[in-house]
Curated annotation (Swiss-Prot):
EC class of the enzyme, as a word: transferase
Keywords annotated in UniProt: DNA-directed RNA polymerase, Nucleotidyltransferase, Transcription, Transferase
Sequence intervals crossing the membrane: none
Single GO BP term: DNA-templated transcription
SUPFAM superfamilies the UniProt entry points to: beta and beta-prime subunits of DNA dependent RNA-polymerase
Family (UniProt): Belongs to the RNA polymerase beta chain family.
Task performed by this protein: DNA-dependent RNA polymerase catalyzes the transcription of DNA into RNA using the four ribonucleoside triphosphates as substrates.
A GO CC term attached to the entry: DNA-directed RNA polymerase complex
Name the record gives this protein: DNA-directed RNA polymerase subunit beta
One Gene Ontology term of the molecular function aspect: DNA binding
EC annotation from Swiss-Prot or TrEMBL: 2.7.7.6
Reactions performed catalytically: RNA(n) + a ribonucleoside 5'-triphosphate = RNA(n+1) + diphosphate
Quaternary state and interactors: The RNAP catalytic core consists of 2 alpha, 1 beta, 1 beta' and 1 omega subunit. When a sigma factor is associated with the core the holoenzyme is formed, which can initiate transcription.
Name of the gene: rpoB
Length: 1342
């Protein structure tokens, strides 16, 4: 196997049994591809901005004399890059410029004669851009647009499960859902009449919509019913016979064929009878006249002479009506064919309750329903109906909707118009009646073939279109009004509504979320999240159990494990590892093709609908060496059911065992041994892990770690291969390989690293180089580790030595006992960075001022501020310290007339200011790591701001100069090589000034041209760098664009180092979470016979009832992995020969049943082996892929190889007494995470503080600096103890006795510890509430 440079440094032993057919796809592609489609020009105009423009333009004036046409658009360059936007708190966006053409037509001349054409580029607002990691920077914070799972447009058939009507009858309904426009519903009521609703308004008989489409009663009946013909022959009534229609009927008269009775009266007609009738080829049978009574006429029958209606269509026939028909000369007439079983008379019944009889009446009825209270006119009614479903401006099924619509109605063609047609409406009604008749099935709305994904690009496009439509109205009016000859397109377009719509979507939509930036995994998962909530989706309260449940079609598309616990369970899902969306927005998952029982390497992506047609085997189906399916019967899935089939019936096979789970679940080793509920908690808690100070790769992983770390974008990845030319803490320079160079390029790549920056969750983002000078790298290699990554692998926690045993009750109820050494070694120490901002505004009474001159503040409090009143970088501060001194002008105090007079004469303003400085919040401590000052344009900068500016300029200059030097060296290096090859000596070149080299001549003309090209490049490079520096300088010096009324903003960043302490929450990866109860001295911890203490002690009772056995297997395998590392460490210390090391490594990597990894240590160079051995001394990292992991036998073999007991249990000794524990204890290594639920953030205590306005009781919660509620049950407890005085104190002075508490405070200050309880304010509130009911209560003071 070929390993990249970074992978070679530490090769993970893989226990996977199956070869990977398909590499893990790029994890963020759902975001990036969707936005790319939105932003990139699309010549077809089907997607993105292009589609939005084409759908709104051209805009024609009301009179038709002018038209505004769309030509093209282009996006400009963003003003600031991503990092600058984050620092300045602005949106990372690019200006959108649209080329429009205004065409004026000559009114006098013939239609379509053009008078004037004007073209112009118009600015249409800013479009936020996506960063390369799939996020948006909005107002300085990183946000993610979560994809939405919504009901696909199309037609759906469903029933109410018998809940609507008291009889429990199942009522069927059909619903046509467009992408935009009015919903159209058809539904049956309990009497089997068919109704229609538009936009969920009141229902009308369904025939009304057909009448509005210009159907007559006859046409309606002809469309929905088959007919039976009757003929009067020789005084007998004959009926046309279709034998099949008689099946299941009971004969009410003898059915005679060719003189013989086939069915007697009262007998049921069976299949045998029908065969007999068909055999006799009977076309007509005689029926008694009574048989026709009650049948329904299929047509209008008018008297040939008088024109008078004899029978109208849909009229039930009586004997009299039949006689009338006969008299009028109608020897042959037709009635509707209906029966109870599968030809219901629904439309016929519906026509009876329909009051309208003409198209106009139907239109008026629809108008009244849509616009109650407005008087209908013919034009208005027609216009409304036309606009509802037949106007492309108001109604659009979209390509997806049309495809789903046509597929559901079993049409050949899947394309068509976006609006509805007559046929569409009729076909939907026909299909619904078919379902009611039992000839078709209803749809499953939770099937993933009926739910589609709406991603960023599509949602942004919709918002943009909304903005454009708002502009369209204004443009239409302006085109009709002003003097068009002098106007340009720019004067017609106002970009505000467009930018407002886009800004609103990115800033405050429910699906635009503050990115979860705890660690790389939480970022990746957030971007791959699929939500059913949001605009146009479900609401938590209304979502039932079915929508939330796992559906068979989730297989390989949505993860069945990862979803939040709580009210959102099942509504927020995560994409499976290999899942992707197709062109229509439906989720697809890959499968390997199987042909005649032979597995091929051909991979097809199938959507949920396509999958139903095939037989699909699982990835773990047994196979022979040559890739055939082994067993006779193979477990497989077909049409959503699990079943067994023969090998030759199998058509597809899963790509990988981890295909069904999401990224987070795929990171849990031995997931297959965990209960699903615990696996859910495990995948959710991994996202809350805080990056530790020193990342530590998991000893037991799953092989997914590298993919997550690289795809998340927190690491620095080489774009091209080459040699490391220079490396320090903040920059890596690569000299690019010759074969990867573009012609005429310096051949130097420079990567800048992010240092100690704050994340959205206040954790610390810091990148560290993991390459050395002179090392060769390939494209895609990891050059620097980010937060929670170690050598390019995800590292969320630490490998700790665990013992499963009780220890003096300190691990009761999932508590965790931790060794003090873990704290001393900073294993679980994390750095948190907090941002505190001080804003100076312009108030009515004058501007606020940032200054060190603060009234009534002692010297000590100002000791950490500089002369501008801003704290020094590096100062250590604690709660209550001043960070930024600020004073605010105070309001006028009540002045005496004399003072007023003096003020009026001398005009001096009140010199009163009050202290409004930024202080460190209570309970926060830390070190100031950075200060930033933003000053409004036109406001003078203070000394500190100028210092910061100078420093930034210096940094920028230094950076650019170094960068320039590196690139220049590259250029001179190439020209030197050319000149040396041309015969110039080293000495001569060294004596000359480098810039003179370009003046030397070379005989070979091609080389001379190349030298001239390089010289030209050098000049260009210098010019480019001067321009870059000027740009940088301008950006640093210019004032900042601050909100209105803000003069200055000072941001102070505090770094807090948090060690692990009792009360912090920790967890493993299997949902095994707990709180630290005690940090125990090293000497008291249980230790083994060599005196090595364990790091943490967990309760063994936490395992059996929770059924997450994966953690035990992880501990055993962790012990073996660590044991191998220790064995290698001993070999190094004994200075064994390199070939012995190679042999041992080969033995380790070859261990296992069928190992797909095949590491050949012989291929590695001696240096590679030394590096590898050095990295393995702390433990051999192993991978046990999900559902394809290490077997018990393999774990035992590895333990044996490491010279450890195969049971995984060892004898432990009590640290305090030195005695051995009674029985052996399971000891090993588990990967433990420290979660972002730290006791420091939760600890809180109040003495006095703010009170609620009405009840005067203290507020609750840490944010309000509130008190602890002494509730009803606590009162009972004190009552039970008879502690009357304590209780009185709780209910009065400590709560809402206003006078009492003030007095008490005063007494304490005076050193007098007495209290006098008074009347609690809540009692007064009660009195007032009773009085508001009209009952007067007064207290008699005796």
């Amino acid at each position: 196997m070929v390993y990249s440079y970074t992978e070679k440094k530490r090769i993970r032993k893989d226990f996977g049994k199956r070869d990977q057919v398909l590499d893990t796809p790029y994890l963020l592609s759902i975001q990036l591809d969707s936005f790319k489609q939105f932003i990139e020009a699309d010549p077809e105009g089907e997607y993105g901005l292009e589609a939005a423009f084409r759908s709104v333009f051209p805009i024609t004036s009301y009179s038709g004399s002018a038209e505004l046409q769309y030509v093209s658009y282009r996006l400009g360059e963003p003003v600031f890059d991503v990092k600058e936007c984050q620092i300045r708190g602005v949106t990372y966006s690019a200006p959108l410029r649209v080329k429009l053409r205004m065409v004026l037509y000559d009114r006098e001349a013939a239609a379509g004669t053009v008078k004037d054409i004007k073209e112009q580029e118009v600015y249409m607002g800013e479009i936020p851009l996506m960063t390369e990691n799939g996020t948006f920077v909005i107002n300085g914070t990183e946000r993610v647009i979560v994809s939405q799972l919504h009901r696909s447009p199309g037609v759906f058939f469903d029933h109410d499960k018998g809940k609507t009507h008291s009889s429990g009858k199942v009522l069927y309904n059909a619903r046509v859902i467009p992408y935009r426009g009015s919903w159209l519903d058809f539904e049956f009521d309990a009497k089997d009449n068919l109704f229609v609703r538009i936009d969920r308004r009141r229902k009308l008989p369904a025939s009304i919509i057909l009448r509005a489409l210009d159907f007559s009663s006859e046409q309606i009946l002809a469309t929905f019913f088959e007919t039976i013909g009757f003929e009067v022959k020789d005084g007998k009534l004959m009926m046309d016979l279709v034998p099949e229609r008689l099946r299941g009927e009971t004969a009410t008269f003898d059915i005679v064929a060719n003189g013989a009775v086939v069915v007697e009266t009262g007998r049921r007609v069976t299949a045998r009878h029908i065969r007999q009738l068909e055999k006799d080829s009977v076309t007509q049978i005689e029926v008694p006249v009574e048989y026709v009574v009650g049948k329904v006429a299929a047509k209008d029958y008018a008297h040939p002479q008088t024109g008078e209606m004899v029978v109208t269509a849909n009229q039930a026939l009586s004997l009299e009506a039949v006689a009338n028909l006969s008299q009028a000369g109608f020897k042959h007439f037709e009635v509707l064919f209906t029966n109870e079983l599968d030809h219901g008379a629904y439309m016929s019944e519906t026509l009876r309750i329909d009051s309208s009889s003409s198209r106009l009446e139907a239109l008026v009825e629809i108008y009244r329903m849509m616009r109650p209270g407005e008087p209908p006119t013919r034009e208005a009614a027609e216009q409304l109906f036309e606009n509802l479903f037949f106007s492309s401006e108001r109604y659009d099924l979209s390509t997806v909707g049309r495809m789903k619509f046509n597929r559901r109605l079993a049409r050949e063609d899947e394309t068509g118009v976006g609006t509805l047609t007559k046929d569409d409406i009729v076909d939907v009604m026909k299909r619904l009646i078919d379902i009611r008749n039992g000839n078709d099935e209803v749809d499953d709305i939770d099937h993933l073939g009926n739910r589609r994904i709406r991603s960023v690009g599509e949602m942004a496009e919709n918002q943009f279109r909304v903005g454009l439509v708002r502009v369209e109205r204004a443009v239409k009016e302006r085109l009709s009004l002003g003097d068009l000859d002098t106007l340009m397109p720019q004067d017609l377009i106002n970009a505000k509504p467009i930018s407002a719509a886009v800004k609103e979507f990115f800033g405050s939509s429910q699906l635009s979320q503050f990115m979860d930036q705890n660690n790389p995994l939480s970022e990746v998962t957030h971007k791959r999240r699929i939500s059913a909530l949001g605009p146009g989706g479900l609401t938590r309260e209304r979502a039932g159990f079915e929508v939330r449940d796992v559906h068979p079609t989730h297989y390989g598309r949505l993860c069945p494990i990862e979803t939040p616990e709580g009210p959102n369970i099942g509504l927020i899902n995560s994409l499976s590892v290999y899942s992707r969306t197709n062109e229509y927005g439906f989720l697809e998952t890959p499968y390997r093709k199987v042909i005649d029982g032979v597995i091929t390497d051909e991979v097809d992506y199938l959507s949920a609908i396509e999958e139903g047609k095939y037989v699909i085997a699982q990835a773990n189906a047994a196979t022979t060496e040559d890739g055939r399916l082994k067993d006779e019967l193979i477990p497989c899935r077909h049409k959503g059911e699990s079943t067994f089939m023969n090998a030759d019936q199998i058509q597809y096979m899963d790509v990988s065992p981890q295909q069904i789970v999401s990224v987070a679940a795929a990171l849990i080793p031995f997931l297959e041994h965990d209960d699903a509920n615990r696996a859910l908690m495990g995948s959710n808690m991994q996202r809350q892990a805080v990056p530790t100070l020193r990342a530590d790769k998991p000893l037991v992983g799953t092989g997914m770690e590298r993919a997550v770390a690289v795809d998340s974008g927190v690491t620095v990845v080489a774009k091209r291969g080459g040699m490391i030319d220079y490396v320090d803490a903040s920059r890596i320079v690569i000299k690019v390989n010759e074969d990867e160079l573009l012609p005429g390029e310096a051949g130097i790549d420079i990567y800048s690293l992010t240092k100690y920056t704050r994340s959205n969750q206040n954790t610390c983002i810091n990148q560290r180089p993991c390459v050395m000078l002179g090392e060769p790298v390939m494209a895609g290699d990891v050059l620097a580790d980010g937060p929670s990554t170690d050598l390019g692998e995800l590292a969320l926690g630490q490998n700790l030595r665990v013992a499963f045993m009780p220890w003096n009750g300190y691990n009761f109820e999932d508590s965790i006992l931790v060794n003090e050494r873990v704290v001393q070694e900073d294993r679980l120490t994390t750095i948190h960075i907090q941002e505190l901002a001080c804003i100076s505004r312009d108030t009515k009474l004058g501007p606020e001022e940032i200054t060190a001159d603060i009234p009534n503040v002692g010297e000590a409090a100002l000791s950490k501020l500089d002369e501008s009143g801003i704290v020094y970088v590096g100062a250590e501060v604690k709660g209550g310290d001043i960070l930024v001194g600020k004073v605010t002008p105070k309001g006028e105090t009540q002045l005496t007339p004399e003072e007023k007079l003096l003020r009026a004469i001398f005009g001096e303003k009140a010199s009163d200011v009050k202290d409004s400085s930024l202080r460190v919040p209570n309970g926060v401590y830390g070190t100031v790591v950075d200060v930033q000052v933003f000053t409004r344009d036109g406001v003078e900068k203070d000394k500190r701001a100028k210092e910061i500016e100078e420093m930034q300029l210096k940094e920028a200059k230094k950076d650019l100069t170094e960068e320039f030097k590196i690139l220049e060296d590259g250029i001179f290096g190439r020209s030197r090589n050319l000149l040396l090859a041309a015969g110039y000596s080293e000495d001569r070149l060294n004596k000359l000034d480098r810039s003179k080299w370009f003046e030397l001549a070379i005989e070979d003309e091609a080389k001379q041209i190349e030298l001239e090209q390089i010289a030209e490049q050098h000049v260009e490079l210098k010019a480019e760098f001067d321009k870059k520096f000027e740009n940088k300088r301008r950006k640093i010096i210019q004032g900042d664009d601050l909100a209105p009324g803000v003069l200055k903003i000072v941001k102070v960043y505090l770094a807090v180092k948090r060690r692990i302490q009792p009360g912090d929450k920790m967890a493993g990866r299997h949902g095994n979470k707990g709180v630290i109860s005690k940090i125990c001295p090293v000497e008291d911890m249980p230790h083994d016979e060599y005196g090595r203490p364990v790091d943490i002690v967990l309760n063994p009772l936490g395992v059996p009832s929770r059924m997450n056995i994966g953690q035990i297997l992880e501990v055993h395998l962790g012990l073996a992995a660590k044991g191998i590392g220790e064995k290698i460490d001993r070999m190094v210390k004994e200075q064994r020969e390199l070939h012995e090391m190679r042999d041992f490594l080969q033995q380790v990597y070859d261990l296992g049943e069928k190992d797909t990894q095949q590491v050949n240590v012989a291929e590695l160079s001696d240096d590679d082996v030394r590096t590898l051995v050095g990295n393995l001394r702390k433990g051999l990292p192993v991978a046990t892929p999900v559902f394809d992991g290490a077997k018990e036998r393999e774990i035992k073999a590895l333990l044996k190889l490491a010279d450890l007991p195969e049971s995984g249990q060892i004898a432990l000794f009590d640290g305090r007494t030195g005695n051995a524990f009674e029985r052996k204890v399971t000891v090993g290594y588990m990967y433990m995470l420290k979660l972002n639920h730290l006791v420091d953030d939760k600890m809180h205590a109040r003495s006095t503080g703010s009170y609620s306005l009405v009840t005067q009781q203290p507020l609750g919660g840490k944010a309000q600096f509130g008190g602890q509620r002494f509730g009803e049950m606590e009162v009972w407890a004190l009552e039970a103890y008879g502690a009357a005085y304590t209780l009185q104190e709780m209910l009065t002075v400590k709560s809402d006795d206003v006078n009492g508490r003030t007095k008490m405070y005063k007494n304490i200050v005076d050193g007098d510890h007495r209290m006098e309880p008074g009347m609690p304010e809540s009692f007064n509130v009660l009195l007032k509430e009773i009085r508001s009911l009209g009952i007067n209560i007064e207290l008699d003071e005796e």
